[in-house]
Amino acid sequence: MLAQDQDIIASNLAAVEEHFHSEAANDIERALELYTDDIVWEAPARNLVFRGKKDVADNYRKLFASIREVEFRNLQRFATEDRVVDDSIVTFELTRDGFLPLQVGQKVEMRLAHIFEMRGGKISKEIAFEMWRPV
């Protein structure tokens, strides 16, 4: 592997790490900076697809207004020059209706697998596979 390829992979991993850190800190604006303008965000289990930074931003603000006490625990993460795959467990408490079919106040543990497509050190597509359960 060329040193340039290793640098690209390291940059991709750093961008995804910063993205998750920003989400956990509820710094949505910083998380959005790590997306390309033509970002596509998908959550297949909930049949959701958002295109473009504005629509993704609206979804993120709604989603993160619906949860609190967010904690990420990374299980594994690896990358290539154009992809990052992440497997994590995220825990949170629901604060409003509309995100998951559970009652407000419910604590949730979610196994969250992501495939990120990367371009120029930013996320151009995020596919989030969500497997949740009340705890």
Residue ranges and their predicted role:
Residues 2-11, 21, 27, 42, ...:
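A beta-strand edge to alpha-helix "cap/lid" segment located at domain peripheries
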Residues 12, 52:
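Hydrophobic (often cysteine-bearing) scaffold residues that line and stabilize catalytic clefts
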Residues 15, 25-42:
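Short, well-ordered alpha-helical segments enriched in acidic and aromatic residues
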Residues 34, 40-51, 62-65:
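A short gly/proline-enriched turn/hairpin at secondary-structure junctions
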